[in-house]
Amino acid sequence: MKRILVTIAALLACASTSQAANYIEAEVLKQAFIQKKTMIVVDIQPAKDFAQQHLPGSIETNAFPAKTTDEKRRLDRTLATIKGSTDPVIIVCPRGKSGAKNSYEYLLSQGVAEERLRILEDGIAGWPFKEYLTQGK
């Protein structure tokens, strides 16, 4: 019984670590735009969705859902910009869920410091400030 409890505790510790991520609320990000704070916005939406709406200055990667090796490699085009800066990195996906977490984990694995990474809470679908959205590429 003791061995089972230790195993369960170890599994829970691993699960909580892999699910941890830093989030940024839409209002906080809006204020950063207003204050013209520098940041790197990595948008993983599919190309069609990105063309319909995205945040200004976003780097289009079309990496969603960032599950496969090919999808994750699409994030590589952001690495030179990210590593050449100390700015925060905001990951934007359709809903701020698994695709964003997959991207977050991939960027971590590529040496991006966790304290720089943020996921837009609720993704572009939850972004309430439509006046800050851009259309087209």
Identify what each model region corresponds to.
Residues 4-15:
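Sec-dependent N-terminal signal peptides
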Residues 16-27, 35, 39, 51-88, ...:
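Rhodanese-like catalytic fold shared by cysteine-dependent sulfurtransferases
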Residues 44-49:
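Short, polar loop motifs at secondary-structure junctions
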